[in-house]
């Protein structure tokens, strides 16, 4: 079993600051509204720790943990008061007391865990990128359908309340026609060590699956349909993974999406969604809880707040529980994830980025 993937240090620091900001607040009673499921996690790295910490804010805890290194799983369980430590993932899958599994391992291992967990009748929340490519996601979706369980992508932007509120207003016609989505995401990763996961082809490294998924997800959420035209330029490094890219997309409604990505330079995580009546600016968009609307007619600025950054992972888990309880709007989120995976698969093919599992 692979150890859980490591989050960027800047993201880790931001998460710690967000947790600290809500430590003494009562947990909102409108997040976990569906019947509670019994969860186990596969992997116990940075993002798994964030999930356990998020749940602690809600007075909840994971029921089980499995990891390639048993001692790490035992330490993780002790730290967070988790009852069950599994020696193998097969033991986890066989446990009838576990309803749902949260997969936090490296991208290239996801499909192996997805196949087995879904076939065992477990609902699954899987970290981004949910799979390496569209073929793997289609396969996982088919297994979920066959076994009547929920598969959900954990990309944060699909679950943050801010995007739900902005889309509600967009769909109501408040903003007019959407014309252009512009998104940047730059993260400086030291290039000297080509064995780290960001540049490691054997760990499905590269900008697209690590940071591009956020930008393309926001773009797709605001577009009326999946882009049919995609043009791009991408740079790769000596290990064969993508390190930067410029992407332009257009759909049948003539809406444009423009995305820039890089692992070699810091850029603001900034999105600007432009409409007839206004533009919406969202900074730090992967876990955003605030947006600014600038109205075209008079230039006045409207501040929109929805959700809380610190609860980002709770929203993911809550959405899966709502989907299991019958909320079709949450089940439909996988459709957006599928569209994004289709775009990422095409872009990597255009750039010549192929992982060992795809050869």
Please place each PLM-identified region on the residue numbering.
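N-terminal Rossmann-like dinucleotide-binding module
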Residues: 2-80
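NAD(P)-dinucleotide binding in Rossmann-like oxidoreductases
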Residues: 235-242, 251-321, 328-335
């Amino acid at each position: 079993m692979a150890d859980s993937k490591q989050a960027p240090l800047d993201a880790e620091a931001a998460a710690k600051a967000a947790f600290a900001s809500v430590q003494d607040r009562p947990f909102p009673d409108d997040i976990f509204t569906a019947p509670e499921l019994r969860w186990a996690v596969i992997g116990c790295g940075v993002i798994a720790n964030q999930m356990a910490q998020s749940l602690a804010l809600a007075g909840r805890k994971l029921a089980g943990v499995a990891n390639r290194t048993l001692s790490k799983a035992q330490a993780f369980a002790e730290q967070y008061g988790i009852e069950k430590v599994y020696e193998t993932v097969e033991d986890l899958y066989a446990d009838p007391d576990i309803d749902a599994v949260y997969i936090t391992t490296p991208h290239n291992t996801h499909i192996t865990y997805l196949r087995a967990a879904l076939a065992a009748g477990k609902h699954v929340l899987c970290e981004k990128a949910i799979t390496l490519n569209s073929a793997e996601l289609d396969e996982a979706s088919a297994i979920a359908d066959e076994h009547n369980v929920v598969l959900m992508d954990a990309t944060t932007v699909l679950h943050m309340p801010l995007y739900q509120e902005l889309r509600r207003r967009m769909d109501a016609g408040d903003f007019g026609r959407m014309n252009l989505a512009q998104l940047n995401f730059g993260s400086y990763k030291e290039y000297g060590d080509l064995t780290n996961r960001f540049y490691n082809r054997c760990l499905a490294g590269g900008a697209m699956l690590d940071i591009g998924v956020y930008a393309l997800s926001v773009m797709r959420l605001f577009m009326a349909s999946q882009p049919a035209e995609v043009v791009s330029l991408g740079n790769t490094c000596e290990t064969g993974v993508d390190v930067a890219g410029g992407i332009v997309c257009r759909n049948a409604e003539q809406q444009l999406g423009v995305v820039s990505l890089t692992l070699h330079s810091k850029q603001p995580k900034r999105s600007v969604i432009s409409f007839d009546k206004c533009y919406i600016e969202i900074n730090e968009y992967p876990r955003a809880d605030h947006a600014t609307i600038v109205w075209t007619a008079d230039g006045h600025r409207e501040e929109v707040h929805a959700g809380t950054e610190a609860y980002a992972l709770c929203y993911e888990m809550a959405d899966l529980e709502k989907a299991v309880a019958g909320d079709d709007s949450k089940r439909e989120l996988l459709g957006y994830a599928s569209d994004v995976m289709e775009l990422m698969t095409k872009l990597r093919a255009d750039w010549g980025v192929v992982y060992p599992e795809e050869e």
